[in-house]
């Protein structure tokens, strides 16, 4: 599994349909920019509001377009273990390289329940499983000790860590060095990716890289190579854009940003709505200041 920067990509819409022409151009833009991986149908890809048929079509389209150049990882999380297994099996049948599985939301399982959830999924699929911890969205936090229990299952290969808790990340890094050093830890927060990699993490699964892929790749590569001065310089330059992309619920701002770059409309599906006037102003200025939009 990759080290570096992977994009959690948008899903472009045209009216109420998937805009495959824009998706094709967008995936090419990502690949040409040197991105290290693509996460399709995650939070940023508006997975909750695509139909089962659309899911299959989107996965097949992305796998074919990428053609093995980078890993294609599909979001298959659910608060039903059986449903997540079904989605994960389908993703692998359609050619995915891995699945990204968010912790179950709303029903708030215990740490034992979380372990059994991931264990059941991992045992049901032939490929890589990545845990996704984002308690701000799910209402549940998978703690480092539980993550490391999961890491002892061979095909659970890493975690997208978006708790926002650096102490928790540090504890995870400390523990994994003893249990399974090759287990990957990616930041799920763009504004903390530099710090996570400097602490020994493996990269970022990024929203920022939807609009600044080459810069994100360069920043993470520099940090992984130990060129902290270069990585810090890029991080600080991009920091206002990182913040701008989250002034409203993701993916509202980034959908507007990719629209400005020419990758389809800014259409989102309800209950998400288009960016406010203030968000548009802030995002556009941040893009211009960072040099990603002229």
Curated annotation (Swiss-Prot):
PROSITE patterns on file: DHDPS_1, DHDPS_2
Site (Part of a proton relay during catalysis): 43, 106
Domain of life, per lineage: Bacteria
Record field: catalytic activity: L-aspartate 4-semialdehyde + pyruvate = (2S,4S)-4-hydroxy-2,3,4,5-tetrahydrodipicolinate + H2O + H(+)
Subcellular location: Cytoplasm
Biological function: Catalyzes the condensation of (S)-aspartate-beta-semialdehyde [(S)-ASA] and pyruvate to 4-hydroxy-tetrahydrodipicolinate (HTPA).
Identification of the protein by name: 4-hydroxy-tetrahydrodipicolinate synthase
Gene designation: dapA
